[in-house]
């Protein structure tokens, strides 16, 4: 089951982005200990772009510490999103013995997307920063 925690918004100033980050940081977690339905998350996220059709880029950012064990097929939903012009990037939180990075690489990210590996939850802040910089800063050539 998907849920939109914060409604879509256009952020054009530093203050708007800062206020948004404070709100996100202080949000309670909606689910804990539930199933992992990556395909459902992709489908739910892709449907949200209908509300903001004038976006220059459509990017879904996925992060998780598990592969799918419920819901829609992640690879099928990824193909649908990609056909709709949506890029999917991810942060795979790899915990001892689990290769979530391999799952994300094979079934979640689109051909123009990428996955960043987080070595556990304590490494997540570094990983999210790396991912955001990679998405927002165009490399010089």
Language model features by range: what are they?
Residues 25-35, 64-68, 114-118:
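Second-shell loop/turn segments in exported
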Residues 11-58, 90-100, 123, 127:
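Von Willebrand factor
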Residues 45-46, 56-70, 108:
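DG-centered beta-turn motif at the end of beta-strands
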């Amino acid at each position: 089951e998907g849920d939109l925690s914060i409604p879509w918004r256009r952020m054009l100033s530093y203050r708007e982005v800062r206020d948004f980050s404070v709100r996100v940081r202080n949000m309670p977690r909606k689910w804990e200990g539930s199933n992992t339905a990556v395909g459902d998350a992709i489908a739910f996220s892709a449907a949200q772009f209908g509300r903001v059709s004038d976006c220059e880029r459509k990017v879904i950012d996925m992060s998780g510490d598990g592969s799918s064990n419920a819901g829609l097929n992640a690879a099928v939903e990824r193909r649908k999103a990609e056909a709709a012009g949506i890029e999917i990037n991810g942060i795979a939180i790899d915990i001892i013995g689990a290769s979530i990075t391999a799952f994300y690489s094979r079934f979640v990210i689109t051909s123009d997307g990428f996955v960043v590996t987080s070595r556990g939850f304590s490494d997540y802040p570094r990983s999210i920063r790396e991912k955001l910089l990679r998405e927002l800063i165009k490399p010089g050539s």
